[in-house]
Every structure is written in C-alpha cells, then in structure tokens.
Amino acid sequence: MAKRKFPDLLHPIGGCGFIQFWKLYFNNWPYTLYSLPSRLLSLMAVTFRIPSVFFEKIRHKNAINSQEIKDGPIFIVGHWRSGTTHLHNLLSQDDQFAFITFSRSLMPLDCLGKLRPARALMKIMMPKNRGMDKVAIGPDTPQEEEFALAALGSVSFLKCLYFPRRIEEYFSSSVFLKCMSEQEKESLKSAYLYLTKKMTYANNGKTMLYKNPACTSRMSLLKEIFPNAKFVHIVRNPFEVFPSMMKLW
C-alpha cells in the first residue's frame, strides 16, 4: 500500500479575508484530521493578514472604486491543457498588458503592499514548478485569476479542488451559467469588477490580460460586466488534450 503523502501546508484559502474564510470553512464541513495542519496554518495566515487587509481597504478604496476600465480585459480561454498557460506567459511579455501575479491572485484583498513576509514564505513553501508539466511558478509569475475569485468569496472552479467531496456541485455552479443562481452570478460579477479595477489601478491603467479555462463558458456574462472585453480562444487537438487531462488528474 502506498504511503500517504503529507498534506500541502500552503493552502490557497489562507489568502481569503476573515469573513470569507469562515464562510468557506463552515459551508464545507466536516473535515478529516489529515487536513488539520493546513487548516490551522490557513487560519493563522488569515488572522495575521487582518491589519493589512483593513489598511489597504482604507487607503485605496476610493481610488479603486473610481478606476476606469477603458480597454479590455483580454481573456485567454480554452479547454484545460490546451496551452492557455503558455499563451498567457507569452502575451504577458508585452508591456501594453498587465497580468495578475501568483501572489496577488492568492491574496487579492491585501496585494497592493510589498507583502514581504507573505512573499518570502511563498518562495520557501511553493514548488519551483507545476508538477504536471514542469512550468515554472513563483510569487511574481503570471497566474489565472480564479484563485482571486475564490478568495473574494465568489463562485470559483478551484473550489472543486479545495473541497473535492462537492466537486460536481462546485463544477456546475462555477462553469455552467445555466446552473448558477442569480446570487452566484452577481457575486461573480462583483468579484470580477472589483479585481479588474484593483489590478488596473495597480498597473497604472494598463489593459488586463487574464487566462482562465473556466471562463470559456462564461463569456456572455463577462461581456455584461465588460462590454469592451476581448477573447482569445486557443484550441488543441482533442486527442492530445484528453491524455493530458488524464495525466493531470
């Protein structure tokens, strides 16, 4: 029998706000003893960040709310394992675009400061690459915004991975618009608008470049939020996508 792997201590829900954390926590009860270390560390991270979340809100709230989104955003969409990450990494080299970094996506509520302690911890605890394809990752590399949506309390495909016992429910409610309630749609709209205004403000008005396979079926909703949004749909041979997806899972 294979030895059970020790759980990852750096869990993304540690980047939530205090209220969002407890909502996620109690909505997905019960948990196993196996996950206790990562749950405790996540709670410590959330509690430790309360002052920085509060002061960032006070300092930047008005500027973020008044930030205009003139162009875009641009969304890279397509099925998982179709090359969205590679295309995102390539296009993010263009200075006319701004992207959300790994650290900012994980901690969207307090990401405008220097985040020195959090970034230092991420460098120590994060793997150097994504295990399934060896793509390099780090606190400052481009990342998809789905982490931020989950941390902001919106619907998010990543909750399928955070809470796998409810994978079918979370997949349907985060990917298929017809399965979303009006409340879930509004939470997604609110989170996207807040995040895009904040990232546009943080990047001096540059057009945001997002990458998110889950948005392939959200395009009509995203057009309601951002009338000037543009989409880049990348397609890969399905006979290559399928085995790649099997390897991923």
Language-model-derived ranges and their functions:
Residues 5-51:
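Charged, amphipathic alpha-helical linker segments immediately N-terminal to NTP-binding catalytic cores
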Residues 54-76, 105-109, 114-115:
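N-terminal signal-anchor transmembrane helix
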Residues 74, 98, 230-232:
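Hydrophobic/aromatic beta-strand patches that form the interior of the parallel beta-sheet core
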Residues 76-93:
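Glycine-rich phosphate-binding P-loop
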Residues 77-79, 209-213, 235:
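Short His-Asn-centered micro-motif
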Residues 93-103:
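Post-Walker A helix-loop "phosphate-sensing" segment adjacent to the P-loop in P-loop NTPases
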Residues 104-208:
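PAPS-dependent sulfation machinery
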Residues 211, 222-247:
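Conserved phosphate-donor/acceptor-positioning beta-strand/loop module used by diverse small-molecule
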